[in-house]
């Protein structure tokens, strides 16, 4: 759109809170628009993420936060990615760690408070952590690309990078 945000289609901007960010799939998971592509792509990514924040999470579900974490990690925003994952874990998961879609704590992070169990939120959560630790979707392996300041002692072993590489780092 005129502000640089991704839209659903020409003339159909993201203007109402919704649990799916299908208009932003080019950022994640597809990686068709990537931070490393330069200023124009960075502007699109920043504007799209800003719009998500501005419209707000009224009708998001837990996996919306997991997906947001992946997109924030792709934008090298470790603080934002960590906050989204924290919200997912604290507000949208049951004590057994199952994702229950709705805000189980009624914290105001979503108007949905229902409990349908779905796995995609948990899978996206795990993917978000990996995106924070290791990215390789562009053909370049980046280690610790989106680590928040509070993660002072970070390491991982045998994460899989594109090209069948196993990577470990401290």
Across the structure, where does each feature detected by a protein language model lie?
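Active-site core of glycosidic bond-cleaving carbohydrate-active enzymes
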Residues: 1-140, 151
């Amino acid at each position: 759109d005129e502000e640089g945000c991704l839209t659903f289609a020409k003339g159909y901007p993201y203007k109402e809170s919704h649990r799916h960010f299908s208009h932003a799939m080019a950022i994640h998971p597809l990686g068709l628009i990537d931070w490393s592509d330069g200023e124009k792509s960075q502007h699109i990514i920043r504007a799209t993420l800003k719009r998500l924040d501005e419209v707000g999470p009224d009708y998001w579900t837990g996996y919306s936060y997991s997906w947001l974490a992946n997109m924030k990690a792709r934008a090298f925003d470790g603080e934002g990615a960590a906050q989204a994952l924290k919200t997912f874990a604290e507000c949208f998961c049951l004590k057994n760690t199952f994702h229950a879609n709705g805000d189980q704590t009624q914290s105001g992070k979503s108007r949905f408070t229902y409990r349908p169990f779905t796995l995609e939120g948990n899978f996206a959560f795990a993917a978000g952590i990996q995106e924070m630790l290791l990215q390789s979707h562009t053909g370049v392996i980046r280690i610790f690309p989106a680590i928040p300041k509070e993660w002072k002692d970070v390491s991982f072993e045998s994460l899989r990078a594109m090209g069948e590489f196993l990577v470990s780092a401290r």
